[in-house]
Amino acid sequence: MTSSSPKTRKSSTKSKAKRGSKSKKAAEIIAVQRLSKTPPPFRNKVVDKKVLKNLVAWAFKHHGTAATAAMADNLKDLGFRYATQAAVSISVDDLKVPEAKQDLLGQAEELITATEECYRLGEITEVERHTKVIDTWTETNERLVDAVKKNFNQNDPLNSVWMMANSGARGNMSQVRQLVGMRGLMANPQGEIIDLPIRTNFREGLTVTEYVISSYGARKGLVDTALRTADSGYLTRRLVDVAQDVIVREEDCGTTRSILISAEDGKFGNRLVGRLTSEQVVNADEEVLAERDTPIDPQLSKKFEQSNMQGVRVRSPLTCEATRSVCRKCYGWALAHNQLVDLGEAVGIVAAQSIGEPGTQLTMRTFHTGGVSTAETGVVRSTLSGKVEFGSKARVRGYRTPHGVEAQQAEVDFNLSIVPTSGGKPQKIDIPIGSLLFVDNGQNIDIDVTVAQIASGTVQKSVEKATKDVICDLAGQVRYETIIQPREVTDRQGNITLKAQRLGRLWVLAGDVYNLPPNALPVVSGNVSVKEGQVLAEASQASEFGGEVRLRDSIGDSREVQIVTTSMTLDDFKLLEESTHSGEIWHLEAQDNTRYRLNTIPGSKIGNNEVIAELSDDRFKTETGGLIKYAPGLTIKKARSAKNGYEVSKGGTLLWIPQETHEINKDISLLMIKDRQWIEAGTEVVKDIFSQTAGIVTVTQKNDILREIIVRSGTFKLCKESKALDRFEGDGQIVNPGETIAKGIKTDSMVMVQSVETPEGKGLLLRSVEEFNIPDQAQLPELKHVKQPKGPSLGVKASQRLAYKDGELIKSVEGVELLKTQLMLETFDTTPQMTVDVEVIQDLNSKGDRLKLVILESILVRRDTTSDSSHGSTHTELQIENAQVVSAGDVVATTQILCKQEGVVQLPDAVDGDPVRRLIVEREEDTITIDSKGTTLLKVGQRVVDGDFVSKDQSIDACGEIENIDGKKVKLRLGRPYMVSPDSVLHVRDGDLVQRGDGLALLVFERQKTGDIVQGLPRIEELLEARRPRDSAILCKKSGTVDIKKGDDDDSVVVSIIEDNDVISEYPILLGRNVMVRNSQQVIAGEFLTDGPVNPHELLECFFTDLRDKKPLMDAAQEAIAKLQHRMVSEVQNVYKSQGVAIDDKHIEVIVRQMTSKVRIEDAGDTTFLPGELIELRQVEDTNQAISITGGAPSEFTPVLLGITKASLNTDSFISAASFQETTRVLTEAAIEGKSDWLRGLKENVIIGRLIPAGTGFSGFVEELNAEAGPHPDILAEDPAGYRRIQNLRPDYTVDMPSSPVAKNTAVLDDPSEEDLEATRSRHGIDPTTSNFAAFARPVGDDELSAEDQMPDPAALEGLQEEGLLSDE
C-alpha cells in the first residue's frame, strides 16, 4: 500500500477499488504520496465533501497552489474512473419510500383531528388551531426525514441517491425528502403557510390540488431569485462605496484597546484564527500561552480551548487607531493566504465583497423551513412516575402557548424535582427563566409525561403583527361571555372599534336568520310562535309625488310602475314629420306658419334648460363669412360656458361686414392672382377656386405654401391724404351715412373704411356694412306653463342666442346663421335625476299630432322570490290599477317576507334609531331535549360544551345554551363557541344576528417571520443601513432596579427604574407589549424592557448617556461605540449563520468601523468645529487634546451611528460621495464650502485617472508623502498614513486655531528641545503616542484685544516659567 513503485501502487489501488463505498480512499493516498517524501499513514475512512475540503486546504497550506491543483486533478480523475467502474447512476427505482411513512401520516392526522375538535369546542382560537396544525406537519416532516435516513442507512447504504446526498456531491436532505418523503408545507404568495400539506412525494406523484399548491412555492422561488439578485448587487455597491478607502497603510498603530472573543460552549471555532493577541495570554496555572501580537493559528486556538480559556482579547479593525485606515497588526491575516496582511492591501473592498457576495446565495434559499419551527426549545419528559416539587425559589406565572395549551412560565431560574412514589433517587430538572411548565407543583405524574419545554436563552426572534378573521359557521345570535370585557377604542381618525380585553368565547346560538329588505318592518313581536308561510315583515313602496299610474310589462326580476307626475301638451303647435335621405325630421308648426325644427326625437328624454326646437329662420343668414360687431345697446347674458352661444338679454342692432375667406393649403405655384389686387366676382384665384364677390384680395402664405385667400368686398378709392390714411390704418373704422371720409370722398350708407396699399397705390377701401335688427323678445305664439302646488312643474320658454361674440371673425365661404331662436324646457322643483319624456299624442279635434312633455316617477316593484339560506320567500302585491290617480305618499306595492319553517321569532335589541335589519326564528331543529338520568347539575342560561355533565354520570354530546329545565327534561339551544384572544377586534356586538360566513372577529397575534433569507437580505440591509424599526423595544436608559406598577387603565403597566442615586425614571408600557423584566431585577443601560426589534440609534444613546455620568467624555464615547459595534457584528453574523453562510468577523468589523467612526459636535468650545457637524472621532480627540494644552475649552460631542448610504455620502472625499448618489447636491455643497479632495481612497483616484494608492501603487503614495513632509520627516512618524497631508501645517509645526483670548496670547516657543517637550508632556499628562503636536496652537497677536485681554494668564505663565520654557521677560 505504501510502496514507492508506481506500478505496485496502481495495482494495489485497483484491488481495493472494487469495494464500492471505499472507492475514494485511494484518492487521499495517491494525492498525498505525490506531495510527501515519507510514506503516508493508511486511513480507513469514507471520504466525503468535508474530508476532501480539509485535504485540499491542508495541501494548499503546506505545498502551495501548483501541487494542490495537480492533486485536485488527480482526485477528479480517480473519482470519475471509479464512478464509471462502479456504474453509479440514478434511476426511478433508487427512490425508495420508507414504509414508516403511512404510520407517521396517520399519527399526524389523529393529532390534527383532536386539534380541530378543540377548536370546535371553543377551547383554542383559530390562530392557535392554525399554528398547531402547521407545527404538527412540520414535526411529521422532520420525523419522516429521519425515517428516510434510517431506511437508506439500514436497507440500502449504496443507494445512488443516498450516496450522492450524503457525500455532499449533489443535493441535500431537503431535496431527498421531497423525492421520497413528503413535499411538506407550502407558503402562499403572501408568505403565509397553507395548512394543507403536500403529503405525497415526487416518486408517488402529486395530486392535482397538491400540484397547484406546490406551484406557489416554485413561482415564489423564481420571483425571489430575480428580485434578490438586484437587491444583493445594490447592497454590494453601497458596501464597496462605504469601505473603498480602507487600505492597510501602517505597520502598527500601537493601540492598547482590543475586543474580547468569548468561547461558545468552550469552543472558539475559527473565530480566533488569523487574529493577533492584544496582550499576554496566560492560563489558570499562570503559564504564558502567547505573547502580545502573536498571530493565532488553529493549533494555538485549540491550545486555548484545552486550557479552558473563556475568552481571549485580540486586536481588531474596530479598535485600530490608525486614522481612516487599518494597520497590519489590527487586521491580522489576509485570509487569501493565511499570512499577515500586506501594506497597501485594499481590505475595505475585500470586506464589502465578502458581505455582499453571499447575498445572492441567500436569495436562492427560498423557503426550506416549514414556517414556525419549535426546534429552538428542548422538551423534557419524566423518566419516572412520582410527585412534582418546584422548590422554594420557584416563581411562575400563567402562560398560554401558541398551541392554546395552558401552561406556566418560569420567572426565575430554579430546580424542579420529581420525587418517585416508590422511593429512590428523584429526577432533577434545571428550569431556566422563560421555560414553560406543563405540570403543577404537587401534581402526581406518570412516566414519560412532558414536564417542561426548556427555553434556549432569550433569543430575540423577529416577530410581526398579523391578523386572522374568525368566520361564522352557522347562522344565529351572538352572545359574549362576560369575561371578554369588550371596550370601545377610538383611533386617530375617530373610528370606533370594539376590542376584547381578555381571552374568552363568543357564542353563536343557532337559529334561522332573515335579512330584511330596506324599509321593511317586522309585523310580529318577539317570542311569538310562527307557522310556515306566515308574514314576518312587510315592506311598502309609496309614490313620492302622486299622479296617474301607468303599468309597464315586467322586465327581469322586477316590474316597473310609472306615475305621471306632471304633463304638458303644446296645443299651439302642429307636429309634422318629414322624411329625408338622412332619416326622419320632426317639425313644430305654429299658427302663423313659422316652423321649428325639433332637436329631440319623440320617445327620448330631455333635462332642464335643454333645447326642444329651433326656429327655421333665414332673416339672420349671411351669404359669406365676415366680421361681426355689436352696436351699442345690444347686451347678452353672462354665462359660464359659451358652448350653446350667447343669450340676448336686450335687443339691438348687429353689424355685419362680409368677408370671403378661402382656406387653401396648396403650393404657391397654383396662385393665379397677385396679393392686394382688385378682383371681380367669379375670378379664379387659385386653380379651381373662384371668388364669389368683388374686392381686394389678401394672400397669406408660409414657406411657399398658400394658407388663406381673403376677399374684402367694397369700393376702392385712391387717396393721397396721409391724415386720412393714418386715421383708417389697421382694423379700420365704421363711418355713418353722410360723413366725409377724405377730400372728395363721401358715403351715403354705413361703411367700414380701411387703409389699403394696392399695386396701383395707397387708398381707402369702403366696405359695406349690413345691419340686422334683433328684437327684445323672441317673436313666438303664447307659451304656457303647468304649475303644481306640490312637486315638479313644467314650462317652455323662448330664447334668442347669438352664435358669435363681439368682434369675432368668421372664416367661411358659405353663409352662416347669426341668431338662433330656441324653444327651451324649463322645470321647477325637480330632483337632478328627474328627466322629462317627449311623447307624441293625437289631437282628437284637428286629427293632427301634438307634442306632449311628461315628468315620470318610476318605481321598480320586486317580483315574488323563493326563499334561500339568508332570506325568506317574498310575495309582492300591487295596490293600484292602470290609469288610477294616486296622491303623494300613497302605497303602490307591498312586499311580504314569509316564514320558511315554523318556530319562535326573536327580534334583536333595538339600537337607538336604527331600523331592524334582521330577525331570527328559533326552529325545532335548533334545540335538543335531554332526559336527565339524575339530579341536574345545570342552570338555565348556562352554556355548555361537548363532554360537560348533565347529571353525575351523564355527559352532553353537543354545545349550546340551556334554555329551559322542566323536571328531568333539559332543553338545550345548539350553538357554537369561538375563542377570541385579548386585543382582538370584534365585528359584532352582544345580541347581534349573524349569517353563516359573516366575520365575527379579527384576531391580532404575533407570529415569527419565516426563518428564510427573504427575511435575511432585508434584515442585513436594515442592520447596515441602521434603520429605525417600527414598534421597537423599549430600552432602559440608566442602570438600576426594576419596580413594576399597574397603569391608569387595567391592563397597562408602568415600569420604574430606581437608580443608585434614587432618581426614578418611568416607562409606561402599552397593552399588548410583553414586559421582559421582573420586579426587583437589576438592569443595565440598554437592556430590553419589552420585546420587539431594537433601534440601534437608541441603544447607542442609552449606552452613552449611562457611561457619560461615570467616565470622561472620550472614554464614554469609545466604550459606548464599542458595545454597539459588538452587537452590530453579532446581529449581522446571526443572519448569515442562520443561512449556513460563513463570513469572517473581520470583514463585518471593517464595515461597522466605517459606520461608527463619526461623532456629532454638540458644542464646539474653542475649536474650529461647528455645532451639528459630523467629524471623525480621532480628529476630535486630537483637536481637543491640543486645545486643552493651550487652555481653551474642548468641544462636546455625541457618538452617532450612520447607515452605509449615509456614511458614503458623509465621507471626506466629495468625488467619492458625488459618484455614489445625489451628485448635484454633493458637488454644490463642496463648491460652496470650498472643499479640497485629498484623493486618499481608490474611487477618487480611479475617477481622476491616477494610480490607486493600494497594491503596487501604495509605495508611490508613500514616496509622495515623504516628498511632501520635506524637512520635517518626524511628522510622518506620528502620522504614517499622511492623513493630515501636511495640508495646513506650516514648517514650524503651527496651525492657526481660534481659542479663548487669553489662550491666544500664551507664548509657546517655536522649537523647544526634545527634553523640554518631554518634561512638559509629563507635567500635563500628555501621551505622545495619541497626541498630535502638529495641531498645537501658536500665539497670534490681535490688535483688537483690550489691554486686559492681552494680559497672559498668570497661572499659565508661572507654569511655563517653572519649566524654564519662558524667560522672565
Curated annotation (Swiss-Prot):
Keywords: DNA-directed RNA polymerase, Metal-binding, Nucleotidyltransferase, Transcription, Transferase, Zinc
Catalytic activity line of the entry: RNA(n) + a ribonucleoside 5'-triphosphate = RNA(n+1) + diphosphate
Cofactor(s) of this protein: Zn(2+)
UniProt binding sites for Zn(2+): 253, 320, 327, 330
MF terms (GO), sorted A to Z: DNA binding; DNA-directed RNA polymerase activity; zinc ion binding
Organism of derivation: Prochlorococcus marinus (strain NATL2A)
InterPro entries recorded: DNA-dir_RpoC2_beta_pp, DNA-dir_RpoC_beta_prime, RNA_pol_Rpb1_3, RNA_pol_Rpb1_3_sf, RNA_pol_Rpb1_4, RNA_pol_Rpb1_5, Rpb1_funnel_sf
PANTHER family per UniProt: DNA-DIRECTED RNA POLYMERASE, DNA-DIRECTED RNA POLYMERASE SUBUNIT BETA
UniProt-recorded name of the protein: DNA-directed RNA polymerase subunit beta'
Compositionally biased intervals (Basic residues): 7-24
GO biological process, one term: DNA-templated transcription
Subunit structure comment from the entry: In cyanobacteria the RNAP catalytic core is composed of 2 alpha, 1 beta, 1 beta', 1 gamma and 1 omega subunit. When a sigma factor is associated with the core the holoenzyme is formed, which can initiate transcription.
CDD domains assigned to the protein according to its UniProt record, in alphabetical order: RNAP_beta'_C
Pfam families, per the entry: RNA_pol_Rpb1_3, RNA_pol_Rpb1_4, RNA_pol_Rpb1_5
Low complexity composition-biased segments: 1357-1369
Function: DNA-dependent RNA polymerase catalyzes the transcription of DNA into RNA using the four ribonucleoside triphosphates as substrates.
GO-annotated cellular components: DNA-directed RNA polymerase complex
Region (Disordered): 1-26, 1294-1369
Keyword Protein biosynthesis: no
Family: Belongs to the RNA polymerase beta' chain family. RpoC2 subfamily.
Annotated EC: 2.7.7.6
Compositional bias annotation for Acidic residues: 1342-1351
